[in-house]
């Protein structure tokens, strides 16, 4: 492999060859190629601009065996998940890509841009700028979207008596990471690992669900660090606590089968699920039930918002204080 190819490809060559096709959208006046992007934003609609950013670093957020296509899709999906938690519609994104010289090759960059494009097209958002530089592999995406005024879901609106819901399945992300780190695996786990592999690298951003629930949910957060940790963040912002019924957690049958001793911990503390955890007042619970029955929203109730005692905001599990040692993923620990 030509170790000097990064010198032969300028930043502008890389952009022109691999990322130019991601910029086409009617509301993008000037995308990549200028000092800054210029986009049309119709303030007459009285929408908030929603901005979310995440950095994914090799060896911290994805294994060093991950392929370019998969890294790109994971980076897109986890950022879109933040917009989903706000009830926002994605519009644009920027990309900060740091590459070691051995990866700055047409094949790797082509796979990476192909992964970006599939997700960008699926969620109708355009690349409008960014930066490329040499260094250890990391991907930073800043996602921009919009949401009507007074309709954004935040973390601070939960009230005592609200029902706690989660979308999708919990524990898949932790099970997937365990699979990735423990290869080779028994053949029965390998057959299941394709679903888990996709759940890790392509978690479904719950944009549709966010739009459906934003008019009835009182608070929302996406589950990146683990249900208990993220629900505790929500409770702390709302000055409340929560009680979760462990038996109500939605866990995929295959995860239960392959990890009978660990699936509860995966669901509660594992993280990387990128599902939505949200609260709905009892007065709107019938409406929520109709959304679930019509399959507009794939979600289940798992608990209730309760009053905090003198110890501050907590998440109880079946009425008992959670083991603080297992409070979810923390960066750099």
Q: What is the predicted function of each stretch?
A:
Residues 1-67, 86, 95:
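Extreme N-terminal cap/leader segments of soluble proteins
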Residues 26, 33-34, 44-48, 88-92, ...:
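Short coil/turn connectors at secondary-structure junctions
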Residues 70-94, 111-122, 206, 212, ...:
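Small-aliphatic-rich amphipathic alpha-helix that forms the alpha element of a beta-alpha
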Residues 38, 79, 87, 127, ...:
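Residue-level signal for inorganic ion chemistry
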Residues 56, 89-181, 304:
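Glycine-rich anion-binding loops of enzyme active sites
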């Amino acid at each position: 492999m030509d170790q000097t190819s990064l010198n032969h490809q300028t930043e502008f060559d890389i952009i022109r060859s691999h990322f130019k096709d991601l910029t086409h959208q009617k509301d993008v006046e000037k995308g990549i190629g200028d000092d800054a992007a210029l986009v049309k934003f119709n303030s007459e609609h009285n929408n908030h601009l929603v901005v979310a950013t995440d950095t994914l670093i090799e060896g911290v957020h994805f294994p060093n065996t991950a392929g370019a296509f998969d890294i790109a899709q994971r980076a897109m999906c986890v950022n879109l998940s933040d917009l989903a938690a706000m009830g926002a519609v994605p519009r644009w994104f920027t990309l900060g890509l740091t590459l070691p010289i051995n990866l700055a090759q047409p094949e790797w960059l082509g796979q990476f841009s192909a992964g970006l494009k599939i997700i960008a097209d699926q969620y109708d958002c355009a690349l409008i700028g960014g930066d490329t530089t040499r260094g250890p592999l990391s991907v930073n995406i800043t996602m921009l979207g919009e949401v009507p005024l007074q309709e954004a879901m935040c973390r601070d609106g939960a009230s005592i008596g609200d029902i706690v819901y989660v979308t999708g399945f919990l524990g898949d992300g932790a099970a997937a990471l365990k699979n990735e780190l423990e290869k080779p695996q028994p053949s029965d786990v390998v057959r299941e690992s394709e679903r888990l592999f996709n759940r890790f690298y392509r978690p479904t951003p719950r944009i549709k669900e966010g739009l459906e629930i934003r008019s009835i949910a009182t608070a929302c957060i996406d589950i990146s660090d683990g249900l208990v940790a993220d629900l505790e963040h929500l409770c702390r912002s709302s000055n409340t606590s929560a009680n979760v019924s462990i038996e109500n957690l939605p866990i995929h049958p295959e995860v239960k089968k392959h990890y009978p001793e660990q699936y509860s911990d995966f669901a509660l503390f594992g993280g990387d699920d990128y599902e939505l955890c949200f609260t709905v007042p009892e007065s709107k619970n019938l409406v929520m039930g109709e959304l679930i029955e019509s399959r507009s929203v794939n979600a289940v109730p798992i608990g209730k918002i309760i009053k905090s005692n003198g110890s501050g905001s907590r998440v109880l599990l079946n009425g008992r204080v959670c083991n603080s040692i297992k409070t979810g993923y923390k960066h750099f620990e």
